């Protein structure tokens, strides 16, 4: 059977209603995406301090509807637009999606990711490319971050070059747990991951067990107390600025702080939020993103 995807770019205020109308009118599935995802203009909406979900779509939203081969995209889009009171049907494109062995197709699209000198993120259906590699077994779709984003790569490269054996380490905003897991594999001591999303905490625990790593993951209120030799936070600039005093307080005197999720144009503002406690500088930049690091004065 041949399927088709109908792709529409719509205004934020219309995205949710239009997606519901498309589904009610016979679309097999409908999703709403940020049309600017993976660009410097992407918008954070959910699951971040300072970005409460007061709106349910992005400024430039992309609605993707999966249609069966018997559906008429023009009629469906027109009917959906009429159902929600739009004066005109939005422009759309249609692309064919052949029926496939989706498991095999997905696996073919995810190869091992090489990061730094010796770190590899390897899907479970692949073997490690190097016997001496630091290997993280992590499947796409089971996690909130698999090492492909520039900010994750920057943090992992920093860890590979700077981790000291036995350091007490905190990964704040741990997502999939990837940074905490690689830090532990590189030799840190007690290693803790914290996230405000319970699903991320569960994903991190699963990934740590799968990688045979002893690391603790929890919600912020359940996190261990005290300071850390190393604190890593790969989030986004606004929550990083809001959490500056809290994160600085978690770093022991003489300890180090590493931040990413920051665009190059945002680096100065983020560093300014931390300047009174920890002077930060750009360690490395990639694809418009930066990794900031600094040492807390003793």
Swiss-Prot record:
Keywords assigned: Cytoplasm, Methyltransferase, S-adenosyl-L-methionine, Transferase
Subcellular location: Cytoplasm
Keyword Transferase: yes
Main location: cytoplasm
An annotated GO BP: methylation
Enzyme Commission designation: 2.1.1.-
Record GO terms (molecular function): protein-lysine N-methyltransferase activity
Positions bound to S-adenosyl-L-methionine: 152, 173, 195, 234
GO cellular component: cytosol
Highest taxon of source: Bacteria
Substrates-to-products reaction catalysed: L-lysyl-[protein] + 3 S-adenosyl-L-methionine = N(6),N(6),N(6)-trimethyl-L-lysyl-[protein] + 3 S-adenosyl-L-homocysteine + 3 H(+)
Family: Belongs to the methyltransferase superfamily. PrmA family.
Annotated function: Methylates ribosomal protein L11.
HAMAP family referenced in this protein's UniProt entry, alphabetically: Methyltr_PrmA (MF_00735)
Protein name in the entry: Ribosomal protein L11 methyltransferase
Lineage: Bacteria, Pseudomonadati, Pseudomonadota, Betaproteobacteria, Burkholderiales
Gene: prmA
């Amino acid at each position: 059977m041949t399927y088709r995807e109908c792709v529409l770019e719509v205004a934020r205020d219309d995205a949710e209603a239009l997606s519901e109308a498309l589904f009610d009118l016979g679309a097999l599935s409908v999703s709403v995406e940020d049309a600017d995802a993976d660009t410097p203009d992407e918008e954070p909406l959910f699951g971040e301090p300072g970005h409460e979900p007061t709106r349910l779509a992005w400024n430039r939203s992309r609605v993707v509807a999966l249609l069966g081969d018997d559906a008429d995209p023009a009629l469906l889009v027109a009917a959906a637009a009429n159902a929600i009171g739009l004066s005109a049907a939005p422009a759309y494109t249609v692309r064919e999606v052949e029926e496939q062995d989706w498991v095999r197709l997905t696996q073919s699209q995810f190869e091992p990711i090489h990061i730094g000198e010796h770190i590899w993120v390897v899907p479970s259906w692949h073997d490690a490319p190097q016997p001496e590699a630091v290997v993280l077994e992590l499947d796409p779709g089971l996690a909130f971050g698999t090492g492909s984003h520039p900010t994750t790569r920057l943090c992992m490269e920093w860890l590979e070059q700077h981790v000291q054996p036995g350091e007490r380490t905190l990964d704040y905003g741990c997502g999939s747990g990837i940074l905490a897991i690689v830090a532990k594999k590189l030799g840190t001591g007690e290693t803790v991951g914290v996230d405000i999303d319970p699903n991320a905490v569960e994903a991190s625990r699963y990934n740590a067990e799968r990688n045979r790593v002893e690391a603790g993951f929890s919600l912020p209120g359940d996190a261990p107390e005290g300071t850390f030799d190393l604190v890593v936070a790969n989030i986004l600039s606004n929550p990083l600025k809001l959490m500056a005093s809290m994160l600085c307080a978690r770093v022991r005197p003489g300890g180090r702080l590493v931040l990413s999720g920051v665009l190059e144009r945002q680096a100065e503002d983020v560093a300014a939020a931390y300047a009174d406690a920890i002077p930060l500088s750009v360690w490395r930049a990639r694809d418009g993103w930066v990794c900031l690091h600094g040492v807390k004065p003793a």
